[in-house]
From Swiss-Prot:
GO terms for molecular function: structural constituent of ribosome. GO terms for biological process: translation. It comes from Anaeromyxobacter sp. (strain K). NCBIfam families: rpmI_bact. Keywords: Ribonucleoprotein, Ribosomal protein. One of its GO terms (cellular component) is cytosolic large ribosomal subunit. The keyword Aminoacyl-tRNA synthetase does not apply. Belongs to the bacterial ribosomal protein bL35 family. This is Large ribosomal subunit protein bL35. Residues 1-20 are annotated as: Disordered. Coiled coil: none annotated.
Length: 67
């Protein structure tokens, strides 16, 4: 039986962790210094976050060899 392939789009956007959670980077940070974003908006966009359980289930299907 051939090896299952990981979805390349998911590979670029998400990181499955050993704990079973899926880490991602927030959208809208390409141009953080853009005019129109408040300090609070920029602060909340910093860093990474984990997906909700419902979305996590869908994304995990894209990673056949992740736990």
């Amino acid at each position: 039986m051939p090896k299952l392939k990981t979805k390349s789009g998911a590979k670029k956007r998400f990181v499955p962790k050993k704990s079973g959670k899926v880490k991602f980077r927030r959208a809208g940070v390409r141009h953080l210094a853009t005019f129109g974003k408040t300090k609070k908006q920029k602060r909340h966009l910093r860093g990474t976050d984990h997906l909700t359980p419902m979305d996590e289930k869908k994304i995990k299907e894209c990673f056949p060899y992740a736990r």
